[in-house]
């Protein structure tokens, strides 16, 4: 019987281990994106920020702009979601059917073959095209993937954590979301709680 030297056996074991390595599923994380509008000449202007909080099946997104703040809270195992909107001193609360958040109707996807590094995470890029004529260039890492990916419906099939995405409308308008922070610390449950007495409920 052929006997392999210990060093070769160790090397082969490492190769097998690496080939079987899978993307790590992260049950709790927070991601912050800076939002830039891109002019036709390529100039960028900061127009807002988007924060994502994920814990298990629960997700909270906060979109902040100079004009308003909008929050979406949902659980992928529940039928309803909550939208909070703050415009000046006015605060509104609305319940919506989570099922009504329909996935984007994608008609094509193409990997760009571009390899980059964002916040020390190795990333690759894919371009998604939808039936309405819009396109989204998504840069993501396969090192980790959150338990909830549908904080943007187009991300449902992305096999990792999205670090940057650029939306280009059929009219040519461009909005860029770039992660400036990824925090894998535990998320407390009160992040998803809402003091409903502070809001006016609307239909």
Language-model regions, residue ranges each:
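Bacterial Sec-dependent N-terminal signal peptides
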Residues: 1-26
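Extended soluble regions of mature proteins
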Residues: 23-203
């Amino acid at each position: 019987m052929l006997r392999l030297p210990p060093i070769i056996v160790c090397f082969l074991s490492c190769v097998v281990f690496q080939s079987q390595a899978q993307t790590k599923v992260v049950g709790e994380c927070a991601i912050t994106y800076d939002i830039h509008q891109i002019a036709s000449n390529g100039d960028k202007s900061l127009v807002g920020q988007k924060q994502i909080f994920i814990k298990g099946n629960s997700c909270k997104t906060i979109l902040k702009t100079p004009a308003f703040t909008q929050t979406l809270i949902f659980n992928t195992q529940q039928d309803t979601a909550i939208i909070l909107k703050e415009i000046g001193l006015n605060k509104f609360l609305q319940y919506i059917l989570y099922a009504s958040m329909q996935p984007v109707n994608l008609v094509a996807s193409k990997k760009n073959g571009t390899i980059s590094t964002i916040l020390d995470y190795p990333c690759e890029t894919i371009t998604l095209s939808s039936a309405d004529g819009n396109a989204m260039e998504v840069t993501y890492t396969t090192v980790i993937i959150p338990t909830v990916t549908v904080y943007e419906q187009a991300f449902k099939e992305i096999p990792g954590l999205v670090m940057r995405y650029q939306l280009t409308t059929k009219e040519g308008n461009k909005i860029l979301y770039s992660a400036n922070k990824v925090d894998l610390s535990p998320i407390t449950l009160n992040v998803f709680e809402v003091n409903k007495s502070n809001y006016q409920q609307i239909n």
